[in-house]
């Protein structure tokens, strides 16, 4: 970045493919909304069944629980959010936030870089980049698992968030399926009816995000199992961090 001669900079992962009009669209949005750091979620290409299950969970977890209006009207660090695959910033904002040097110990720049900007009193935003870029993050089942684990501690797999998020995710997306099965086995009509409502409401965010971000219906159908697996991986990451163990990612481990 130090050698760049322009005032607007783009940080993009090597596996992200941009559409011809992507940069102009992002720059126009950034200028129109006076955003210091703009992030976009590229279209996530998923081929394997585990990719279809787990990759779209980032839309459900991040955007499903993020109050977007409040995030856009505030610079509080608590509302920091982004996608590390694609960032657009301006030189002065990047310098004021401390550059990537401020987050050099982190592998979750999608969260940490927006937080650094907000700590400096700057505005950040995250938008849907489905029509602007595409990316396939993982190419194997093992890669998906490692990818989820590597960012987990800086996301929700920490002492402050793991319990409430486990209750929210399991209670909203897994428990209604369990109670539906039990109500069918016990022939309890009203419990079954209430459970069906719970299942629909629990799957609705996944369905809406699948439509918005053009994700597979396969992930929607198996959303309860995907959520259960996702939460289990968060707890694995939580225990691993407590034991001082790190996850290797593309030849690197945490320091």
Describe every region a protein language model picked out.
Residues 163-165, 169-244:
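Membrane-embedded multi-pass helical conduit in multi-pass membrane proteins
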Residues 17, 88, 107:
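Short aromatic/basic micro-patch
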Residues 12-13, 40:
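Thr-Gly-centered strand-to-loop micro-motif
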Residues 1-5, 25-96, 101, 152, ...:
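Long helical/loop segments within the catalytic core of UDP-sugar-dependent glycosyltransferases
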Residues 30-33, 37-64, 92-95, 100-162, ...:
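Catalytic donor/gating beta->alpha subdomain of glycosyltransferases that bind UDP-sugars
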Residues 9:
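Short aromatic/hydrophobic "clamp" motif used to bind/position activated sugar donors
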Residues 242, 249-250:
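Structural motif
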Residues 14-29:
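Acidic donor-binding/catalytic loop of UDP-sugar-dependent glycosyltransferases
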